[in-house]
Amino acid sequence: MHCPFCSAVDTKVIDSRLVGEGSQVRRRRQCLVCHERFTTFEVAELVLPRVIKSNEVREPFNEDKLRSGMLKALEKRPVSSDDVEMAINHIKSHLRATGEREVTTKMVGNLVMEALRKLDKVAYIRFASVYRSFEDIREFGEEIARLQD
């Protein structure tokens, strides 16, 4: 790491501590040239995979789209915003854990449906009806029957 005082390349770590619930490392460093001390913080860069849409277009994962789709399905339902955020974080963790650089929208959609199924059955049916393009009332009935199993 370059010294912010003299721009020297050589610095040494004097002290390291975990901060922020263990998600960050705070390091005290000292420049080997000018002997000034400074603090740095390290955070893991957690990269989400790119999303392959049904038309084969690839785009970066968009957490806002995920949140918006879930909130639309959960509109006027008794689910706390904390529960929604936990579900979103779980989906993102699952996507990171795949280790893949790209995932399909189908995979993301299935993860959303799984999360909504656990949060609220009505929201699940709302989302599934749009996601799976239900054509008639029979398809709603079949999906509701599957929920009751």
From Swiss-Prot:
Negatively regulates transcription of bacterial ribonucleotide reductase nrd genes and operons by binding to NrdR-boxes. HAMAP family: NrdR (MF_00440). Binds 1 zinc ion. Residues 49-139 form the ATP-cone domain. It comes from the Bacteria. It holds the Pfam family ATP-cone. NCBIfam families: transcriptional regulator NrdR (TIGR00244). GO terms for biological process: negative regulation of DNA-templated transcription. Keywords: ATP-binding, DNA-binding, Metal-binding, Nucleotide-binding, Repressor, Transcription, Transcription regulation, Zinc, Zinc-finger. The gene is nrdR. This is Transcriptional repressor NrdR. GO terms for molecular function: ATP binding; DNA binding; zinc ion binding. It comes from Pectobacterium atrosepticum (strain SCRI 1043 / ATCC BAA-672) (Erwinia carotovora subsp. atroseptica). A zinc finger (unnamed) spans 3-34. Belongs to the NrdR family. Its cofactor is Zn(2+).
